[in-house]
A protein has these predicted regions:
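Catalytic-core region of carbohydrate-active enzymes that cleave or remodel glycosidic bonds
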Residues: 173-176, 181-185, 210-211, 215, ...
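Active-site mouth of glycoside hydrolases
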Residues: 2-208
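Acidic-and-aromatic substrate-binding clefts and catalytic sites of carbohydrate-active enzymes
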Residues: 32-38, 63-73, 154-157, 192-201, ...
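A conserved amphipathic helix/loop scaffold
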Residues: 412-652
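A short helix->loop->beta-strand "cap" motif at the edges of active sites that frequently abuts
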Residues: 91, 182-184, 244-246, 426-430, ...
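Aromatic- and carboxylate-lined catalytic core of secreted/periplasmic carbohydrate-active enzymes
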Residues: 275, 279-362, 375-388, 453-498, ...
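Active-site beta-loop-alpha junctions enriched in small/polar residues
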Residues: 23-25, 60, 98-102, 150-152, ...
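Phosphate-binding active sites in nucleotide-utilizing proteins
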Residues: 368-413
Length: 652
């Protein structure tokens, strides 16, 4: 299956953005009142020295548009100088029009007077006029490389609105930008916050944004209870956004030094940068360029003190560890010539239930959050199993070109989808489904359409009840060889979930063969051969159990996924012998292949990757390795995959 690697195009050339969200340390959001060109020059210089080539900048709306029909010329003169400082540093910027929300506070021009930003016709016209005026003044400057409508409009607007209203608002602003001559890449700046890329209901739909925008821009600041999931959440949201075929820019990510130590901040940046690259991201804009210790008495920093310390540099311009990590990432991008690289195709598809992104009548409000968390955990397990995985949305039609379909801990799909999955299996694919009754008491149970016939079992469910998992640790004892798992193998899983979801599916085989039994001798993993392929049923919600368990990863689901991949014939160019190390491959347009090894181990680890026949592992400079790779704690290694030289025939 194709995996999205779309690139932003600027002036006819594909580009990758690496930069910082920018407020000068002279004023934060009030920088335009206290603008100092020399300070900006120094701030940009340190970013450029560390490999960053662009910024995201902001028109602070109350200052730039003090009256509904007037632009403040003093502010625009300062922004013009700001663009010159970028040109001087050989950098570019993406201005943001409606600001709006910033760093824990909403900032209104006084003339808004509570008007609705989406439905008040006069108010929408004022926004469109302002965007058009900024484009007319600055759109021809070579330092402008894109446009954003807002900063996190779902927060600034004060609530949600119907999807069609928000789409119309976005189109009006987009049309104003284009009418004013703005041909640079355009997007919304909304954070990609909506049920198509998260479990949030904000009225914004990525499908609409993809139709209107040149790229999609997730803002990701996860809070969780599992470090590995933290490291993959930004990548997961980039994958979800990428299903719409547009370039994906990780528009905001970062950490406050008040919350995270310097070493751990660097580690987090490293993981987010590399994992999101492997998830198809084409740009990375960290939050933000500087600390603001001198602004402690100024809102929003006065009441959100942690916002003082999100910087890539401290308040004196000295690089923090996360900026050093961005430089290392920039060096890697340059070494592999990232603009010419694409993700290798995938043989594995992760099925995204339409109940994540579609509102069906009389379904539980908690369903989208449950699905998001479960799918994210399944994605982590697939990555740690070294399975190149593509997402396929049920709402867009499940793609038919994968060898392995993962349907993890699922309560419900549409009835026709179950029959489609069985047809895919009959045509030669392997379809894996793990059971879940869902996490809500509403319609509790598997809505599978034809469960018994599809999986070759007879379920033993009882009216209104779930079969609770009473063991704190669930055991899978393999009674038959399956893929990479030999008979006699024992896998264990920590049980998790609530009174509804911590449940297994009692079944009797009726045509399916039992691959593994639980600790009580009940079927835990079953296989039914159908046509040229097979369906595999897991009677425990192993992905949901892990998703509901703190500090769960790495865990044994990745071993099941690895076995599924082997059973299905999934092709992998590189795989590690340690489930704490994830492998993936980028392919350059000249045929060069680059292997990424990303460690989730808290200590140094040495692995000897298993390579596809005819390949050997080389350093980026082309020199040979001994076939092994040593990674620092939570480290990343990037290598070339070279063709092994042909053997020289021996002479008689």
């Amino acid at each position: 299956m194709h995996r999205n690697s779309a690139r932003i195009v600027v002036a006819g050339q594909p580009v990758n953005w690496l930069g910082a969200n920018f407020w000068s340390r002279t004023g934060g959001p009030l920088m335009w009142r206290n603008y100092d060109p020399d300070t900006v020059r120094k701030e940009l210089a340190v970013l450029r020295e560390h490999g960053l080539g662009m910024t995201r900048s902001f028109f602070y709306w109350p200052d730039f548009m003090p009256e509904p029909d007037r632009i403040d010329d003093a502010m625009t003169e300062r922004f013009a100088d700001f663009l010159e400082r970028h040109a001087e540093a050989d950098m570019s910027t993406v201005p943001t029009f409606i600001v709006g929300h910033m760093s824990g506070e909403n900032w209104d021009p006084p003339w808004r007077d509570g008007r609705d930003l989406y439905t008040d016709v006069w108010m929408v016209a004022r926004q469109a006029w302002f965007a058009g005026e900024m484009v007319r003044r600055f759109g021809a400057h070579p330092a402008v490389c894109g446009w954003l409508v807002s900063n996190e409009m779902p927060i600034y607007s004060g609530g949600s609105a119907p999807r069609e209203v928000i789409a119309a608002w976005a189109q009006i602003i987009r049309d104003a930008v284009r009418a004013a001559g703005g041909q640079q890449p355009f997007s919304l700046g909304d954070g990609a916050w909506g049920t198509q890329a998260s479990s949030q209901h904000a009225g914004f739909a990525l499908a609409d944004a993809a139709r209107l925008c040149d790229f999609l821009g997730p803002h990701v600041y996860p809070v969780g209870d599992d470090e590995v999931r933290q490291h993959y959440t930004a990548a997961w949201e980039c994958e979800l956004a990428g299903t719409f075929g547009r370039p994906v820019v990780l528009e905001e990510f970062g950490v406050s030094s008040d919350f995270v130590s310097g070493a751990n901040a660097a580690r987090y940046y490293r993981q987010v940068l590399h994992n999101s690259l492997l998830a198809g991201a084409t740009g990375w804009i960290g939050w933000c360029n500087s600390d603001y210790d001198d602004l402690a008495g100024q809102d929003p920093y006065r009441h959100h003190a942690f916002e003082l310390h999100f910087g890539l540099t401290d308040s004196h311009g000295r690089p923090k560890p996360q900026l050093t990590e961005m430089k290392a990432f920039a060096d890697t991008l340059r070494a592999v010539d990232i603009g010419r690289c694409q993700r290798a195709p995938a043989d594995t598809a992760l099925v995204v239930s339409s109940y994540l992104d579609t509102s069906y009548p009389f379904t539980a409000p908690s369903d989208p959050g449950y699905i998001y968390d479960t799918l994210r955990q399944a994605y982590v397990s697939a990555r740690l199993a070294d399975l190149p995985v593509a997402l396929t949305r049920e709402s867009e039609g499940v793609g038919g070109d994968a060898m392995l379909y993962l349907v993890p801990s699922v309560k419900q799909l549409l009835a026709p989808t179950w029959h489609q999955l069985e047809r895919l299996a009959r045509a030669g694919a392997t379809v894996y489904v793990s059971y879940s009754p869902g996490s809500a008491g509403w319609h509790r149970g598997p809505s599978y359409g034809h469960l018994n016939a599809m999986f070759g079992v007879e379920h033993q469910l009882r009216a209104g009840l779930v079969d609770a998992i009473e063991d704190d640790q669930v055991a899978f004892n393999f009674v038959k060889d399956f893929g990479t798992l030999a008979a006699g193998t024992r896998l264990t899983f920590r049980a998790g979930g609530n009174e509804h979801s911590r449940a297994y599916l009692p079944v009797r085989p009726d045509g399916a063969e039992v691959l593994a039994a639980d600790g009580h001798g009940r079927p835990a993993l079953l296989l039914r051969r159908v046509g040229a392929g097979s369906v595999v049923l897991c009677t425990y919600p192993v992905e949901h159990m892990a998703a509901a368990t703190p500090r769960a990863n790495p865990e044994a689901t990745s071993a099941i996924y690895e076995a599924l991949g082997a059973h299905a014939g999934v092709r992998k160019l590189v795989t590690a012998d340690d489930r704490r190390v994830a492998c993936d491959v980028l392919v350059r347009s000249d045929g060069a292949r680059f292997a990424w090894l990303v460690s989730q181990a808290s200590e140094p680890v040495t692995v000897k990757p298993e390579l596809a026949p005819g390949l050997w592992l080389a350093r980026l400079d082309g020199s040979a390795t001994d076939g092994a790779a040593t990674l620092d704690p939570f480290g990343v290694g990037v290598f070339r995959l070279e063709n092994a030289p042909a053997a020289t025939p021996s002479t008689p």
